[in-house]
Amino acid sequence: MELRVGNRYRLGRKIGSGSFGDIYLGTDIAAGEEVAIKLECVKTKHPQLHIESKIYKMMQGGVGIPTIRWCGAEGDYNVMVMELLGPSLEDLFNFCSRKFSLKTVLLLADQMISRIEYIHSKNFIHRDVKPDNFLMGLGKKGNLVYIIDFGLAKKYRDARTHQHIPYRENKNLTGTARYASINTHLGIEQSRRDDLESLGYVLMYFNLGSLPWQGLKAATKRQKYERISEKKMSTPIEVLCKGYPSEFATYLNFCRSLRFDDKPDYSYLRQLFRNLFHRQGFSYDYVFDWNMLKFGASRAADDAERERRDREERLRHSRNPATRGLPSTASGRLRGTQEVAPPTPLTPTSHTANTSPRPVSGMERERKVSMRLHRGAPVNISSSDLTGRQDTSRMSTSQIPGRVASSGLQSVVHR
């Protein structure tokens, strides 16, 4: 018995969660390709997936926008089938011991600004800019940054007249508190400036490893958000960015200086970081930190394997008094046999390019990520899978995610 959607896509295991609904690994039966399938129960109090799928369709054709394969309803679920992507920047950040080099941060910043600019050009703001919502591509697109999850996106201007939405206050926080702009904390309607300010906090998060307002304790979520807001507003940008190139402070100051309906100068912000990139003498080779770690891990595995074989060889000779003290080739000739090296066990580096390891837990979480980075591994692992924790700082007044139960897919079953 297998589960199918759209009479073409085979439903596999759960691989993550979006702002509304759960994400599953799937297979395009006709093409033999793996895909991502997002499901949302139609009985959810505030269905959002059909809205998100419409936004994705409006975004189609943009660089770093996932391709949508199919949208529709199947039984008790709204379904969206989309291109399968690689690990998120949060996954990769954990893999790199929660610290990115300046080069990697600048390479990412360039693409991330462009993704946000493209969304804004399509008359929408994202409203949940965070590392989990930027994924790397797979295979030939392994160096391309994608932006995902439009569950909280909102139209900020009329597509025909470009009339901007009105300024409003007393709005509830929508998005993730850790990266929310100060104006969002103050209850001001979000606009283009807020997406970019959130990106500034993401970049400093990559630089620092954590932000000053992380880990704050409070009795309720509301009080926690208030503490985050107070800490964020009381931390001067120059203090937040101390020890790092001034361009990061310049970026954040620029974002905070924008008025509600201002169009940001995206080219200026990109050039700010590109000039820094060139002054540092970096090369646009798109070698990120995780690529270097992957290479280092492969080389270390090879060295360890050679050392193991040498150790076994020495032990074998030490147990044979007739050959003790003789080189391995000589001992082989004395026995009238050829010297045969012991078989090499499989290591993570010996997998084929499109093989994905099964998820593991506990002490092997980091190993799970390292084995799948840029090998064409199809699984999009969420940061909560890696850390065993969930980010509870995300809040939207209408967010009531639907959970998928296997028993609820009866109408999707094909025998």
Swiss-Prot record:
Q: Which disease is it linked to?
A: Advanced sleep phase syndrome, familial, 2: An autosomal dominant disorder characterized by very early sleep onset and offset. Individuals are 'morning larks' with a 4 hours advance of the sleep, temperature and melatonin rhythms.
Q: What is the species of this protein?
A: Homo sapiens
For bias type Polar residues, the affected ranges are 347-358, 380-400
What effect is documented for mutating residue 46 to R?
In FASPS2; strongly reduces kinase activity
Instruction: List the SMART domains hit by this protein, alphabetically.
Output: S_TKc
**What effect is documented for mutating residue 44 to A?**
In FASPS2; strongly reduces kinase activity
**Location within or outside the cell:** Cytoplasm; Nucleus; Cytoplasm, Cytoskeleton, Microtubule organizing center, Centrosome; Cytoplasm, Perinuclear region
Q: Per its record, how is this protein called by name?
A: Casein kinase I isoform delta
Outcome reported for the amino acid change (mutating residue 176 to I): Impaired kinase activity and abnormal subcellular localization with exclusive accumulation to the nucleus
Subunit structure and binding partners: Monomer. Component of the circadian core oscillator, which includes the CRY proteins, CLOCK, or NPAS2, ARTNL/BMAL1 or ARTNL2/BMAL2, CSNK1D and/or CSNK1E, TIMELESS and the PER proteins. Interacts with DNMT1 and MAP1A. Interacts directly with PER1 and PER2 which may lead to their degradation. Interacts with MAPT/TAU. Interacts with SNAPIN. Interacts with DBNDD2. Interacts with AKAP9/AKAP450; this interaction promotes centrosomal subcellular location. Binds to tubulins in mitotic cells upon DNA damage. Interacts with GJA1.
EC annotation from Swiss-Prot or TrEMBL: 2.7.11.1, 2.7.11.26
Region (Centrosomal localization signal (CLS)) location: 278-364
Which InterPro entries does the entry link to? CK1_Ser-Thr_kinase (IPR050235), Kinase-like_dom_sf (IPR011009), Prot_kinase_dom (IPR000719), Protein_kinase_ATP_BS (IPR017441), Ser/Thr_kinase_AS (IPR008271)
**Key words of the record:** ATP-binding, Biological rhythms, Cell membrane, Cytoplasm, Cytoskeleton, Disease variant, Golgi apparatus, Kinase, Membrane, Methylation, Nucleotide-binding, Nucleus, Phosphoprotein, Serine/threonine-protein kinase, Transferase, Wnt signaling pathway
- Where are the catalytic residues? 128 (proton acceptor)
Out of the domains of life, which is the source? Eukaryota
Query: Region entry Disordered: which residue ranges?
Result: 301-415
Query: What SUPFAM superfamilies would the database entry show?
Result: Protein kinase-like (PK-like)
Q: Where is the Protein kinase domain?
A: 9-277
* MF (Gene Ontology): ATP binding; cadherin binding; protein kinase activity; protein serine kinase activity; protein serine/threonine kinase activity; tau-protein kinase activity
Catalytic reaction equation(s): L-seryl-[protein] + ATP = O-phospho-L-seryl-[protein] + ADP + H(+); L-threonyl-[protein] + ATP = O-phospho-L-threonyl-[protein] + ADP + H(+); L-seryl-[tau protein] + ATP = O-phospho-L-seryl-[tau protein] + ADP + H(+); L-threonyl-[tau protein] + ATP = O-phospho-L-threonyl-[tau protein] + ADP + H(+)
Which GO CC annotations does the UniProt entry carry?
Answer: actin cytoskeleton; centrosome; ciliary basal body; cilium; cytoplasm; cytosol; endoplasmic reticulum-Golgi intermediate compartment membrane; Golgi apparatus
- UniProt biased composition (Basic and acidic residues): 301-315
